[in-house]
Amino acid sequence: MPRGTGYLRARIRHLVVTRAADRLTLGILGRRHRAQEIALREVELRVPGWPASRDGLRIAHLSDFHLGDLMPVGRAVEAVERIARRRPDLVACTGDVVDLDVDGCEPLLEAMGAVQAPFGRFLVLGNHDHLHDAAELVAMAEVHGLRVPHGQVMRAGDAADPLLVGGVDWGRTVRELDRAVDVLPAVPDLLLAHNPKAFHAAARRGIPLTLSGHTHGGQVAFPGRPRANLSFAHRLSAGHYRRRDCALFVNVGAGAWFPLRLHCAPEVVLLTVRRG
């Protein structure tokens, strides 16, 4: 399978940092991390610009599973099945399905695609999804009923009054993401972007709600202060932000790249979106 730019560097980092940390602690860090429950968090989000006809829409927001050594596929599937039992209206996965290789990720994509959500199931890719074989991951996702709106705005729900769902592919910088958001063919109601830096352009375009991941909430935060964390490269790192009538929600992720999360529990999130 093809390997994207950065695969070798990421593989070396994984061996030198992630696995080494686990071995130095005689496997304790890894075992504790894998045993940590993925929380199902419920959040009511008030968004001034949200369509009145979609008040109360419930979104299963999934992000950053990082399938691999630190996230067995069964653990990820169980988290998806748990949130599926809450009967969300829409499923939104904001990337980093895998940590390194796409091999073995199909059961998770199948579980996401099996969620009975009347507004559909959507996925955008993160930086880790591009390391190995992004095209293969997208193909598997689409086979299992996930829609991938990279650079597109798709209609969801009632054909007469659709919810417009847009998505942008992974971008590292504000400039890259500004371009990606600015060229969307329409202004969506909901934007999916792995990197929360897309919110700058989204708010400028008047997109009511943006969902992101990527930051992991720093993985280590101060007790009771989720935004006071180790994600130094991201001012928008955890939870809810607002700019004028537009809102951003950053999921801190179900997985990790390093086997430690402190005061920053792994999560899947059931969002209830209210206008106001």
Language-model regions: role of each:
Residues G56-H66, P162-G171, L190-H194, A247-G253:
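Active-site-proximal beta-strand elements of phosphoester/diester hydrolases
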Residues V97-D99, N127-L131, M154, G171-T173, ...:
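Solvent-exposed loop/turn segments at secondary-structure junctions
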Residues S53-R147:
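Membrane-embedded segments
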Residues A60-S63, L90-D96, G120-N127, P149-Q152, ...:
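Active-site neighborhood of phospho(di)ester-bond hydrolases with catalytic His/Asp-centered motifs
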Residues I38, V47-A60, L146-R147, V153-G166, ...:
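Beta-strand-turn-beta hairpins that frame and shape the catalytic cleft
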